[in-house]
Amino acid sequence: MAVYTDVSAASLSDYLAAYDIGTLVSYHGIAEGVENSNFLVQTTTASFILTLYEKRVDPADLPFFIGLMQHLAANGISCPQPVAMRDGTMLGTLAGRPCAIVTFLPGVSVRKPTAANCGQLGRALAQLHLAGAGFEITRRNALSVSGWRPLFEAAGPRTDTVHPGLAAIITEELAAHEAHWPAALPAGVIHADLFPDNAFFLDDTLSGIIDFYFACNDLFAYDVAVCLNAWCFEADGAFNATKGRALLAGYQAVRPMEAAEVEALPQLARGAALRFLLTRLVDWLNVPEGALVRPKDPLEYLRKLRFHRAVASARDYGLAA
């Protein structure tokens, strides 16, 4: 979450009049994240999250995001619920941006996940994959392998200003993945961005999942690979196989992976690291002036990518033989 677009108290109060959720008491921007402008809004009835969808979000995708949260909640996943206006509309416009209000999900994210946290996350991810079955709207993953070269081109010659030799590494990775990216694996709705700040815990129990604005249809095992990258590395860049083992065991307890998924996991994890390296690189080089946003270090994912390049099999991630 982040804030790129400011909202005045007067305009927000006027906007809330279209809802039956009380009147504005207070609000403030949320700096975490990188994609949209988000505000915690307190009204006379409850707390809510207001999201303004910024220019990188295609308005045509918004019905997918809104509908998916409704579908997942109806199928047992704890996630924010879109709030309808009095006329039943879920999407509005504020400060020149498409926007939506969703319910506030209680809980806190963990900054240093434990193996137990990772195990719960694995189970929740598998439950999400199963719950997505039957959701009729689809959205392609614009940040899968076909979208990585355009990101690299957007960074352009400035790439090596972030790290000497980075452009050559990315060029090599793109060639490898474009030639051999797995395709014929189980697929469906995935979260695609399930980092620790998008999972909430209460009393060490996972209480919900948020931020579905990268969700799409893609390989389930790719979503697992994203989570291995996001949850199982330590601050010094070392992969924690105990956490990896817990995450994978939690996932497999709910949705056992096929042999082909297990075999593809090293390449999927390597590709996921490249994806976040590239998006962080572009964001790092293009922070809007005055935006309340903390760009994330792309080199964190260069270090992870180097680990994945040395992986021999899924056993290196802690997967039981």
Swiss-Prot record:
Reaction catalysed by this chain?
L-homoserine + ATP = O-phospho-L-homoserine + ADP + H(+)
Q: Record's HAMAP family? A: Homoser_kinase_2
Tell me the protein family, please.
Belongs to the pseudomonas-type ThrB family.
Q: Which GO terms describe its biological process?
A: threonine biosynthetic process
| InterPro entries assigned to the protein according to its UniProt record, in alphabetical order | Aminoglycoside_PTrfase, Homoserine_kinase_II, Kinase-like_dom_sf, Pseudomonas-type_ThrB
Task: Output this protein's name.
Answer: Homoserine kinase
Question: EC no.?
Answer: 2.7.1.39
Q: Which UniProt keywords apply?
A: Amino-acid biosynthesis, ATP-binding, Kinase, Nucleotide-binding, Threonine biosynthesis, Transferase
State one Pfam family annotation.
APH
Q: Which domain of life is it from?
A: Bacteria
Q: What gene name is given for the protein in this entry?
A: thrB
Q: In which pathway does it act?
A: Amino-acid biosynthesis; L-threonine biosynthesis; L-threonine from L-aspartate: step 4/5
Give the species this sequence originates from: Azorhizobium caulinodans (strain ATCC 43989 / DSM 5975 / JCM 20966 / LMG 6465 / NBRC 14845 / NCIMB 13405 / ORS 571)
Q: Which GO MF terms does the UniProt record name?
A: ATP binding; homoserine kinase activity
